[in-house]
């Protein structure tokens, strides 16, 4: 009986809790319905939120969107200072009883997206791009300072990328206290003001700091809407004590902040696609046919854009994206710098993109079975040890394992310490590519021209034209005009006059196909050492790959096949299971991956090297030249963009680079900070030197 009473009491408490939470959700929904006037005449809304807030607050936004016209889209950008707030929020979300099946589906999708408490911006995409959540885990003022804004003013424009409104989240006694209470300051609200439209109000759910927030909003030019109290009628109260002159002063200060930030980034251009209403020129042209181009097509389709893909093969993923299996895991560095941060975010984004495609019914082979990385000699082992001990890595990103744990994780005898990436695994690249393109075709007007080998591109009167040599006549077939052209063509990235100077080099890679047998059948995680070895898929393991610079041909190589076998044996010396690695069938696949010296992808405006080189003749090796290169917009080919240089980790880094480029092309705030955009910019190899006064 006592146990029965406890159970009844527990159920009663749970019922009471859910009833209260549902009532709070209704209150939030009522509040947001009062804000519907902000959406009048707009297709896209950008909400900013200081503090992770409550489950009910998030669900209220989703509920509001569900009742809005289907053409309306929301980008919700959440800024949370305390990383340890996230897991408790997800736990509460998982245990929440939704009032509707639609919200239940959203909750399930969000929890499956598995956001992780790491620094930076994690992009979560729902409802085919209709609802996008950017989760910024860091000091909000640091996140806002590093946020790159497209060229714009603060006017209330339907197409403005700036924030339409902000909320300051309530604190919740049932969760970890948010760091926002310590973060709210005049300096923070000026950064909020910088990224906001002039008319954007602030809605305050934080009753504890109501008076202080009201004063800060007055000083930074915001109108404030807040609840009177939790016990009073749920009617928002608008507060704005600014005179017309004070308002103008605040708006000028915002404009000055935007200008100052823009001036600091002139050498890292972030151009966007030009737009012409009802024009065929507004179609986005992409040259390519692999992971990068397919995922760019999908990201553009989620924004209702028209896309034409030009591929020189008979189908997608016939080049480097055509392997049977590819490992997915982040590239970590001891300093956990911008490159390391990018790969962590890319790693998580690729997982979520795959999960979304699988949920939509597309067939993609994969297994998130983890990745086990071990050294193959003393130097590589020491480097791995340095990486894993240098930072307090999130355990879901990576953690160290000893020799016994490594064997248990792998299912076979490894007997080496190393790094385990629990969320990693393998994905079938060509199926991942095809699924992304097929999904894009469902969402928007997206199609491909196959067997179309573009030999030449040119710009005339601001439009781009693509030229193909016709086989029968030797003449040219021309496609265009297009306002926007993206080169995402892998090994052909620098084949055109406009891109031939890009600092990316082709490396041949032969991946060997190994029949699954004996001890290899027990392998249950991806092994990475001097090369990689995957668990079997359809009776075949993949291992490799060779690494040959500027290859003369792409034929099968017996010597590279033998080298792949030797790499496995060298990596796991004396292990009996390596005798089961059989290369005698001579089964392999060869591709060329484009590699950059700094291991970062290339994403962004196509640099005009001819103009850079010409200007360099008059501006070099002096303090004045440093000032010139920092304060002069870097030369670019207007309307031409680059997406490539993905190297050996294309399925880890490519989808996020594609999503970021789509955001850039569409004039949105990019989900990468300014330092990362500088890291990825195709002009970086030259501009790094020039802004330091070094020789080109």
Swiss-Prot record:
One of its GO terms (molecular function) is flavin adenine dinucleotide binding. Transmembrane segments: none annotated. Disulfide bonds: none annotated. It catalyses: 5-aminomethyl-2-thiouridine(34) in tRNA + S-adenosyl-L-methionine = 5-methylaminomethyl-2-thiouridine(34) in tRNA + S-adenosyl-L-homocysteine + H(+). InterPro entries: FAD-dep_OxRdtase, FAD/NAD-bd_sf, tRNA_MAMT_biosynth_bifunc_MnmC, tRNA_S-uridine_synth_MnmC_C. In the N-terminal section; belongs to the methyltransferase superfamily. tRNA (mnm(5)s(2)U34)-methyltransferase family. In the C-terminal section; belongs to the DAO family. This is tRNA 5-methylaminomethyl-2-thiouridine biosynthesis bifunctional protein MnmC. It comes from Shewanella woodyi (strain ATCC 51908 / MS32).
